[in-house]
From Swiss-Prot:
PANTHER family (alphabetical): GLYCEROL KINASE, SUGAR KINASE
Annotated EC: 2.7.1.30
Broad class of enzyme this protein falls into: transferase
Gene encoding the protein: glpK
Similarity field: Belongs to the FGGY kinase family.
Organism field: Burkholderia thailandensis (strain ATCC 700388 / DSM 13276 / CCUG 48851 / CIP 106301 / E264)
This protein's name: Glycerol kinase
Function of the molecule: Key enzyme in the regulation of glycerol uptake and metabolism. Catalyzes the phosphorylation of glycerol to yield sn-glycerol 3-phosphate.
């Protein structure tokens, strides 16, 4: 396998990407193609499943051919994907019966309220680790069965298949032979029992979803089967699958209990490895599966922040303070601090650990002396404050003091933000040399399954530091900053609650 590579397919919310990795974990080639976002009604978000497949197959071929290689140069394929997004297709024709309903879609919010009113919340959380929410796949499947003509009858006859995006890609790569998913994607459906590691019949009955629709659940690192499409002339083992955030946790080599990563994108996704025992959160975090490798399941706590990098986009597009997102660091660095200004970017409510849907964006402490630089700094600081709130909830739930924070995603390139994050947390923020950790994680999982890499220890030896940000702020100053932030969050919530 000396001259072979691992192909990672990263099927995201706005684009399909493919990356080739060599044995040292370096990116050899990369290809990307965006696809259409479909908004049929306010709060509804859909994708065309055929476009998901065509763009992903296209970039897979492009990444390989652009460096003069072919399928024989690929040792294995790993898949990572946007989670929860729901596709239902006809087993006989292989065609979707409706568009993919995306994780952001809120059309089933009222139905979720009905499930809560039936007293199902505790049962769902105990079995799946998840709150009842339209974010997850279960109610999206139910909506398709209830609203697509003939769907319920076809499902009863066993003619329909459900899958998250990974399942849909594998189904197509194997010419409709394999209907599988992995434990990480299954754990995001609200139908999978994370303790028994099987679909939960009681929840399937409650949601009136036939078990025959569901894929077989497999480990995150194993050979599922060979490709059979014309995308590649040779058959390549499909050998790794993980949801995007779990893949990033693995790509960051957070393989020990208590290790944490934060992906700074449009929002933030924080995940802590909690080892081989699931921890039920008392602080509004999600309990989920991190991965299953070598027969062992690792669990994780996860917290999502709705607005992170998006606050920078707002400064650019909404206020016109900056012309491009990259300008914010220099502007914010023009002042030593915010001078008491706090921005709570609750443009779409507050995510973990607050989960307040009514809260709205709020700005506090503004004076005549407040400048665009202060606003820019307050915007960056808000990302670090929100992340700290989730990290403190993780520490409280797990009883583990975080030793360091591994960071990735677009906004992790902002040195000012990373330094402030380290200052608030009181431990180092650590940025790796390869920040494409999601694709890297998928590559690692596939490579382990075929022996391309011997074991996790070999992968640990590859992880390389790009920069370490050590805390430098006095703790008294940190405490003062945090008091101001907590006041601002309380006020933002109070404003939302006081509608009189």
């Amino acid at each position: 396998m000396q001259d072979q590579y691992i192909l990672a397919l990263d099927q995201g919310t706005t684009s399909s990407r493919a990356m080739l990795f060599d044995r040292q974990g370096n990116i050899v080639s990369i290809a990307q193609k965006e696809f259409e976002q479909i908004y049929p009604r306010p709060g509804w978000v859909e994708h065309d499943p055929q476009e998901i497949w065509s763009t992903q197959a296209g970039v897979a071929a492009e990444a390989v051919t652009r460096v003069g290689l072919n399928g024989t140069s690929i040792a294995a394929i790993g898949i990572t994907n946007q989670r929860e997004t729901t596709i239902v297709w006809d087993r006989e024709t292989g065609h979707p019966i409706y568009n993919a309903i995306v994780w952001q879609d809120r059309r089933t919010a009222d139905f979720c309220d009905q499930l809560k009113a039936q007293g199902l919340s505790e049962k769902v959380r105990a079995k799946t680790g998840l709150p009842i929410d339209s974010y997850f796949s279960a109610t999206k499947i139910r909506w398709i069965l209830d609203n697509v003509e003939g769907a319920r009858e076809k499902a009863r006859q066993g003619k329909l298949a459900f899958g998250t995006v990974d399942s849909w890609l594998v189904w197509n790569f194997t010419k409709h032979e394999l209907h599988v998913t992995d434990v990480t994607n299954a754990s995001r459906t609200m139908l999978f029992n994370i303790h028994t590691l099987d679909w939960d019949d009681e929840l399937l009955d409650a949601l009136e979803i036939p078990r025959s629709m569901l894929p077989q659940v497999r480990a995150s690192s194993e050979i599922y089967g060979p490709t059979k499409t014309t995308v590649f002339a040779s058959k390549i083992p499909l050998a790794g699958i993980a949801g995007d955030q779990q893949a990033a946790l693995f790509g960051q080599m957070c393989t020990s209990s208590g290790m944490v990563k934060n992906t700074y994108g449009t929002g933030c996704f924080l995940m802590m490895n909690t080892g081989e025992t699931p921890i039920e959160s008392q602080n509004n975090l999600v309990t989920t599966i991190a991965w299953q490798v070598d027969g062992k399941v690792n669990y994780a706590l996860e917290g999502s922040i709705f607005i992170a990098g998006a606050v920078v986009q707002w400064l650019r597009d909404g206020l016109g303070i900056i012309k491009s997102a990259s300008e914010i660091e220099a502007l914010a660095a023009g002042v030593p601090h915010t001078d008491g200004v706090y921005l709570v970017p609750a443009f779409a409510g507050l995510g973990a650990p607050h989960w307040n849907a009514r809260a709205r964006g709020s700005l506090f402490g503004v004076t005549r002396g407040t400048t665009s630089a202060h606003l820019a700094r307050a915007a960056l600081d808000s990302i670090a404050y929100q992340s700290l709130d989730v990290l403190k909830a993780m520490e409280a739930d797990s009883g583990i003091r975080i030793g360091e924070l591994r960071v990735d995603g677009g906004a992790s390139a902002n040195n000012l933000l990373m330094q402030f994050q380290a200052d608030l947390l009181g431990v180092d923020a650590v940025r790796p040399r390869v920040t494409e950790t999601t694709a890297l994680g998928a590559a690692y999982l596939a490579g382990l399954a075929i022996g391309y890499w011997k074991n996790v220890d070999e992968l640990h030896s590859q992880w390389q530091l790009e920069r370490r940000f050590a805390p430098s702020m006095q703790r008294e100053q940190v405490s003062s900053c945090l008091c101001g932030w907590q006041r601002a969050v309380r006020a933002a919530k109070a404003w939302a609650d006081d509608t009189q």
